[in-house]
Amino acid sequence: MVSLEKNDRVMLARQLPLKSVALILAGGRGTRLKDLTNKRAKPAVHFGGKFRIIDFALSNCLNSGIRRIGVITQYQSHTLVQHIQRGWSLFSEEMNEFVDLLPAQQRMKGENWYRGTADAVTQNLDIIRCYKAEYVVILAGDHIYKQDYSRMLIDHVEKGARCTVACMPVPIKEATAFGVMAVDENDKIIDFVEKPANPPAMPGDASKSLASMGIYVFDADYLYELLAADDKDDASSHDFGKDIIPKITREGMAYAHPFPLSCVQSDPQAEPYWRDVGTLEAYWKANLDLASVTPELDMYDQNWPIRTHMESLPPAKFVQDRSGSHGMTLNSLVSGGCIISGSVVVQSVLFPRVRINSFCNIDSAVLLPEVWVGRSCRLRRCVIDRACIIPEGMVIGENAEEDARRFYRSEEGIVLVTREMLRKLQVKQER
């Protein structure tokens, strides 16, 4: 382990990102989000009033100084590719800066899809080697967080690690969805289990487990050796969490990086913010949290902006309807191009070009772009997918049985409405 002085850290914070390439794994479907990902990959799902989920990983790279990025795509990639081409074409090729889109290469006979997260990188190794990076930062494209990857790179170098895994404590009941690790006093990973049925607790806190965040830093040459060996292993599932990280752990080459050391937040005393918005409830809750008085995630930090594709839209408008009712909103995010006419919107998130007609009550709802809500509707605890037309007088979120019959209703009572669901409902009503 190397002890670094403050000046050395400042210098490395500038140099290490320039020697690195980031690979964002963005091919996942996100089946737990149900119909919300039927026509788009999970990283392309809308979030926070104007963003896509992948914007967080991309913005973290940009703000950390990593300007060489590969985005590995697969499932329903058109929306994702279109978003990146329109919103992330800011890099300078002359300065060797880029965002490369890397689809499945289908280099294996009979294989059309990536066999696992490690195989997604393996299939693109010929391209990745051409980047001539010393370090490879591997990221999930479907998490909401702000992190300075340069700090993680410094930690990787300081510990003399060949592989570094970002980690944070999670409630033990949620740890079954993550890789869970045990570490020694120097943060060396001494045990790693992917998605255990009975997660081991952290020493000193029986209520939590130490979970992998799916964020890795590798020495590039070491990664290439690992992937070459894994590719030849017929018994492998070719996955970082299931195969690669456990193997490195057995070899004593993996170290943990506590997320609080590199988490970017305005309040240093606050809990580090990282969300896997993989379920409908988690997605709904994370969106609505941004509309609270003091959100856990600060989206107004000018020192660490989250970038996205910006459309040229007029400002949001709140108008009085012909009956004299005023358009009002409270504790909500309302994006450009929205019109609220004689209705009340409370604790909700409205994406661009949403139209709320008169006499509506919108409470704790997430309305994706171009949603049109007819007069006299009541929407509560729901997510309305893009371009849905909600008929006049429709009530959503008040009758559990009716919601479950017409739409998708989660166990927690969050209702998802899509255009296809509305179309089927209309067909039934016309019979």
UniProtKB/Swiss-Prot annotation:
Belongs to the bacterial/plant glucose-1-phosphate adenylyltransferase family. Pathway: Glycan biosynthesis; glycogen biosynthesis. This is Glucose-1-phosphate adenylyltransferase. AMP binds at R40, H46, R52, E370, R386. Allosterically activated by fructose-1,6-bisphosphate (F16BP) and inhibited by AMP. Alpha-D-glucose 1-phosphate binds at Y114, G179, E194, K195, S212. PANTHER family: GLUCOSE-1-PHOSPHATE ADENYLYLTRANSFERASE, GLUCOSE-1-PHOSPHATE ADENYLYLTRANSFERASE-RELATED. The record marks Q74, W113 as: Could play a key role in the communication between the regulatory and the substrate sites. It holds the Pfam family NTP_transferase. It catalyses: alpha-D-glucose 1-phosphate + ATP + H(+) = ADP-alpha-D-glucose + diphosphate. Keywords: Allosteric enzyme, ATP-binding, Carbohydrate metabolism, Glycogen biosynthesis, Glycogen metabolism, Nucleotide-binding, Nucleotidyltransferase, Transferase. One of its GO terms (molecular function) is ATP binding. The lineage of its organism: Bacteria, Pseudomonadati, Pseudomonadota, Gammaproteobacteria, Enterobacterales. CDD domains: ADP_Glucose_PP (cd02508), LbH_G1P_AT_C (cd04651).
